[in-house]
């Protein structure tokens, strides 16, 4: 009889013991979390599922196709690297991001290590040049220290560094022409990344580094291209964009812009290896209406038969340029098409062409 009673009571006793252990564990966890926050400050440790940490806010790139490929735009509180050959649209891409930040009331800074920023061109892209913070540092150390202080202020939403290749170490500047200072720039970037990464996460500031391409000597097989400044930036960047000029836009013999293709080479906040294409017009920047037309065609909102584009059964233009002109002149139709495009993209409508496609083995060779 006593054996049956003990057997019946055993599960209850085990559950009480488990509850007691769980209570002690929770108490110990709360004590250590409180101790860590007292020692290192509030927010030094947190649960990943907190609502404030789950969703990564973004800054628009200025190109709807690229926003789609990135999962919304440049992520806030992260490091972004944009690299590519000369005259491919790197600076234009970042100036559009600056204009977007300023339009929303934020503060942006441009660290012009190349000493090549054109304020007239920046203003034509919508940048408020009077309120844009600009620094033209003498050395790489000075540039990165300015970047660090801007980040730690938590008052700046976006910092652009143009470019990593122009961040010349002090030892190289103070030395004589022809002196070999091996690895000095890579060491400088590695130290800077270690120092600023933590502050970027706390302040929510986005830092975009522009970078140039170099060729590895003696590479017979594989891609000989590499970026400057060592490997540190490759590891610390949450997003890496490879931008290339794939076509020159012409009207007759007059060149009026380029067609750019961006490969998302790395993305920690959305699926990587997507591709976006858009037009960059000389003196005007990214063609937002051109991006809209591309996506409207891919989502079957605007149809194309031969050279003619049609919307709701009516022809709106013969050829891409004429259709873009029609959309510029008919703002009501443009806004309606944009609303439909965003609605379809939000619903997960499949976009099948270059503006958003995984870079598979087959199309990687084609790209």
Swiss-Prot record:
ATP binds at residues 84-91. Keywords: ATP-binding, Cytoplasm, DNA damage, DNA recombination, DNA repair, DNA-binding, Nucleotide-binding, SOS response. Coiled coil: none annotated. The keyword Iron does not apply. GO terms for molecular function: ATP binding; ATP hydrolysis activity; ATP-dependent DNA damage sensor activity; damaged DNA binding; single-stranded DNA binding. It is found in: Cytoplasm. It holds the Pfam family RecA_C. Residues 1-24, 348-367 are annotated as: Disordered. Residues 1-14, 349-367 have a biased composition (Polar residues). Signal peptide: none annotated. One of its GO terms (cellular component) is cytosol. GO terms for biological process: DNA recombination; DNA repair; SOS response. Residues 15-24 have a biased composition (Basic and acidic residues). InterPro entries: AAA+_ATPase, DNA_recomb/repair_RecA, DNA_recomb/repair_RecA_CS, P-loop_NTPase, RecA-like_C, RecA-like_N, RecA_ATP-bd, RecA_C_sf. HAMAP family: RecA. Can catalyze the hydrolysis of ATP in the presence of single-stranded DNA, the ATP-dependent uptake of single-stranded DNA by duplex DNA, and the ATP-dependent hybridization of homologous single-stranded DNAs. It interacts with LexA causing its activation and leading to its autocatalytic cleavage. Belongs to the RecA family. This is Protein RecA. It comes from Prochlorococcus marinus (strain MIT 9211).
């Amino acid at each position: 009889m006593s054996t049956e009673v003990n057997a019946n009571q055993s599960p209850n006793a085990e559950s009480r013991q488990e509850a007691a252990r769980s209570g002690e564990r929770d108490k110990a966890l709360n004590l250590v979390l409180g101790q860590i926050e007292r020692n290192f400050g509030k927010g030094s440790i947190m649960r990943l599922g907190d609502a404030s940490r789950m969703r990564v806010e973004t800054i628009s790139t200025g190109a709807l196709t690229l926003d789609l490929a990135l999962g919304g735009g440049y992520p806030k509180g992260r490091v972004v690297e944009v690299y590519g050959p000369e005259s491919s649209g790197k600076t234009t891409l970042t100036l559009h991001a600056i204009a977007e930040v300023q339009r929303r009331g934020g503060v942006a800074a441009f660290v012009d290590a190349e000493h090549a920023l054109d304020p007239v061109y920046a203003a034509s892209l919508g940048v408020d040049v009077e309120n844009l913070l600009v620094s033209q540092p003498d050395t790489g150390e000075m540039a990165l220290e300015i970047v660090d202080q801007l980040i730690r202020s938590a008052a700046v939403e976006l910092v652009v560094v143009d470019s990593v290749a122009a961040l010349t170490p002090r030892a190289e500047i103070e030395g004589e022409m022809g002196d070999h200072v091996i690895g000095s720039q890579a060491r400088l970037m590695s130290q800077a990344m270690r120092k600023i990464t933590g502050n970027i996460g706390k302040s929510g500031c986005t830092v975009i580094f522009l970078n140039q391409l170099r060729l590895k000597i003696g590479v017979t097989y594989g891609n000989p291209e590499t970026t400057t400044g060592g490997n540190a930036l490759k590891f610390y960047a949450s997003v890496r964009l490879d931008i290339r000029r794939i076509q020159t836009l012409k009207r007759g013999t007059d060149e009026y812009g380029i067609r750019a293709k961006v490969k998302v080479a790395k993305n920690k906040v959305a699926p990587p290896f997507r591709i976006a294409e858009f037009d960059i017009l000389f003196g005007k920047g990214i063609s937002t209406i051109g991006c809209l037309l591309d996506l409207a065609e891919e989502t079957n909102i605007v149809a194309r038969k031969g050279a003619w584009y049609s919307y709701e059964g009516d022809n709106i233009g013969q050829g891409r340029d004429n259709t873009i002109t029609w959309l510029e002149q008919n703002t009501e139709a443009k806004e309606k098409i944009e609303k439909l495009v965003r609605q379809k993209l939000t619903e997960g409508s499949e976009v099948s062409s270059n503006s958003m496609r995984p870079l598979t083995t087959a199309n990687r060779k084609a790209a």
